[in-house]
Amino acid sequence: QTCALPICSTTADFLFESAQISETKCGLQTLPGAYDENGKSEQLKVVLADKEGKTKLELYYDVYEDCDVITRRAVFKNEGEQPVKLRRLMSMQLDLHRADYVLSTFHGAWTREMNRSEAVLETGKYVNESFTGTSSSRANPFIMLGRKETTEDTGECFGINLIYSGSHYEAVEVQAGRTRIVSGIQPKNFCFTVGTGEVFETPEAVLTYAASGY
């Protein structure tokens, strides 16, 4: 997470402040999000604070037990006296303690939207992104990570989807035998000014896991 603070810093030092668990979801104010028709979900809210920059970062994790889904989003709050320019704020980050995965991305065109491409992960970074102002079938904001032996019926698989129709960014990086996944708004040319007392919320990312195939 990167921001330009009034103290001339390009990073923030967010430290844990509080956490809260509730049985109802605090919905997004400006963007669409996931929901359960029966209202069965739990929410974990983690508040991080940067004392120097007088800003806060609220991380929301919503658990949908019936469908094995966790959603993740972030809300940035400016409680200082000067505006803050956000240049990067991802919706989710997930670290896996393995590196032997196969990345699946999806692309296509009208009437043939979901063509699957696969890449066996090695050391380095793999990016699925859009710069066009839309998501569309040309660069779908949904990715999957499975093991090399994963099939339709066996093996583990992670699925990540960003609920956002604008320019998006999904990156998977492998280093030192570990895998890091991030997903969110496209950071290239992104700059959003958050005024005093204002907030900025990211799109919601949907994460799911299966131990029995795709």
Please tell me what each predicted stretch does.
Residues 9-214:
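Conserved structural scaffold segments of CAZyme catalytic domains across common CAZy folds
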Residues 2-5:
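Short, small-residue-biased leader/transition segments that mark boundaries at the very start
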